Amino acid sequence: MARVRTYHNYNEAWGEWRRLGIPDRAFTRFDLASRQFIFIDSVSKEEVSALQEELAPKKVTVLPCRGDRALVAITPLTLESVLMTGASPRVMEMGEALRFRNDVEPPAFEWSGGSLDLSRPRVMGILNVTPDSFSDGGRHLDADAAMQSALAMKDEGVDIIDIGGESTRPGSSPVTPDQEWSRISDVVKRVSEEVGLPISVDTRRPEVAKKALRAGAVMVNDVSGLKDGMIEVVREEGAAAFVMHMRGEPSNMQDDTRYTDVVGDVYAFLEKRVREAVSAGIPRERLGIDPGLGFAKDVDGNLEIMSRLDELRSMGRPVLLGASRKAFLGKIAGGGPEDRLDASLAAAAVACWQGVHLFRVHDVKETVRTLKAASAMRSGISPR
């Protein structure tokens, strides 16, 4: 499992290398400018030795790190040369990660009977049918009110509507599957019949997901990372799914926000869950990933993820980001949930610049406009 690491400056690189146990000044500033740095995660000492032996003739540096990782410093031209002359599976992983990271083409995202073109950023509008969600709790308990919001989001340019019946904010209490389904059942059916857009069901319960998919939803947004029977439901119903990173439960997830390397640890979790889902029969093209901002992360962890979102693209799966109105934005910019629009749009622009594909948001119109501008600036091509 490989992921491409891009450093913004030498101080950032040196700080991380020191934290991961890489010898001081193992690389120079010239190395930082001339080489591609690729982490290989979940690697044994024997595999590191084999990599060092394989790549030594090409004068490629391979260093072991804390946390069962290795760091490879290689020029893209050298990597291409190694791949063309035959390479081990680990080196093949490096080539694949670099190809995905450089976005040769956008990843496919499909479900039974449909697909979504990710050649431009896509917006997922939040429709919480809950009394206690952190931002819009209580606004859509009535199916008519929920429908009005769904239609308004459609007019504003939303691409997916994400319907949820359980709050998963930090410290929230769980509801029963029956309670969750009773909240969203009419909304899922009506939005499916009357709005004409793909519907995602935001749930961590397989029984709720199955009912929603049979009522018209086409994808599952699962904050628990496809656990406890969810893989089977997604496979059997031909749905797409987003795999999110979280530790623990919403009620206790903020009790432990410590990581060796937050992005590396999140990446390893997501890659493992994607691999398990594919092994269980879900086509890879039906899976997206979400780093889970605010779920078992503190402010610094969230900011580190925001600054390194491009690494997630090394997996070759669509990246979904849920930064909208999150508490960490309030802690750095001030304001309650209703006062975080500007910070939310800043997060969307930063993520767009790093190639994030989908954005789960409360403020559809403003986000659509921000992404249109940010995408045009990133590509240098005006929108058609």
Name what the model sees in each region.
Residues Q148-G164:
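Catalytic domains of carbohydrate-active enzymes, especially glycoside hydrolases
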Residues K154-D155, R273-R286:
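Phosphate/pyrophosphate-binding loops at sites that engage ATP/ADP/AMP, CoA/4′-phosphopantetheine
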